[in-house]
């Protein structure tokens, strides 16, 4: 990781001795892969055997020796591959230009090797406003020259991300968004992505499970103000899943109590239905995950995150707010909408009728109907009176 501290030195050397290093290595790819360093060794060894000295500048030597090490370090750390590819791509672009240190008007497209910058590379939009310290450079447009990264400390660091890398983003932002803004954007991102997916959006918006999920997420973000260690929303999600599992078991017990136990007589059809539901859930998950917007030049593929909290910031395409939704939130949302948590509404209604007896208003209505005037009701009352008197006389006679 110490090679990252030498990034300003590498960029400055690429400006001063980039053309010389490119002529020695033959190509920018050879510099990045280490072939240029081998070529440099062959030249110096051959000159030593002949007893001659070939003047090679210190800047060119730095480029040939440090760039391969930087490439290996960025590829070894998976979390910094995206940022390393863009950084090395910027160095390569500076070396491949007609005037070392300037970026050509037409930037190459991205490649899997990380040697070229990604499509739409715009360092100025991503917060790179670099100026040369060695000589004035005439870039295709202002602010596009590569120079050492400004060194200043970040007041609040982010675990797992070097300060100098985050400074590239922080220099473009006037201030970081508040926790409430972060939560609102994440919630809006979840709703909008699922709405655009078009899969049972009404049920998901109106479901109590989603409301409880968002409340748990909000609680997780608010807890950050008290302690960083207690702000991880993953714990809240895990608790939510456990509570949903217990709720599902309670609903099954309600079904059995209501007289509708689970149908186990057809295991084959039940298994096939479960497999179909799982396939549909997986398809929805993949579709929704693929439709999520991604920033073109974020340092990480999922944005900058702090212990599970995803921070949104403007991208290089014009100040549009971007967000990144982690996969576990999508997974939990899919689980909340799974068929295992759905039970027949008939059983629920029957159980509710048993738990909630007839209301007093219904009883009053029945009493009014029974007391309404009518011949039948009068005859019935007379018959009842006659029966009661006859019974009382017989009892008295027996007693006498």
UniProtKB/Swiss-Prot annotation:
What's a GO biological-process term for it?
A: viral penetration into host nucleus
Show the segment(s) annotated as D1: 307-342
Q: Where is this motif: Nuclear localization signal?
A: 359-369
Q: Which portions of the chain have biased composition (kind: Low complexity)?
A: 370-379
Q: List compositional bias (Basic residues) regions by residue number.
A: 380-400
Query: Where do the record's region annotations for DNA-binding lie?
Result: 347-394
Q: Per the record's keyword annotation, is Flavoprotein included, yes or no?
A: no
Keywords of the record: Capsid protein, Host endoplasmic reticulum, Host membrane, Host nucleus, Late protein, Lipoprotein, Membrane, Myristate, Viral penetration into host nucleus, Virion, Virus entry into host cell
In the UniProt record, does the keyword Zinc occur?
no
| Region of interest called Disordered, as start-end residue ranges on this chain | 99-118, 348-400
- Lipid moiety (N-myristoyl glycine) attached at 2
Sorted alphabetically, the Gene Ontology cellular component annotations on this record are: host cell; host cell endoplasmic reticulum membrane; host cell nucleus; membrane; viral capsid
Q: Which family does it belong to?
A: Belongs to the polyomaviruses capsid protein VP2 family.
This protein is called Minor capsid protein VP2
Q: Which organism is it from?
A: KI polyomavirus (isolate Stockholm 350)
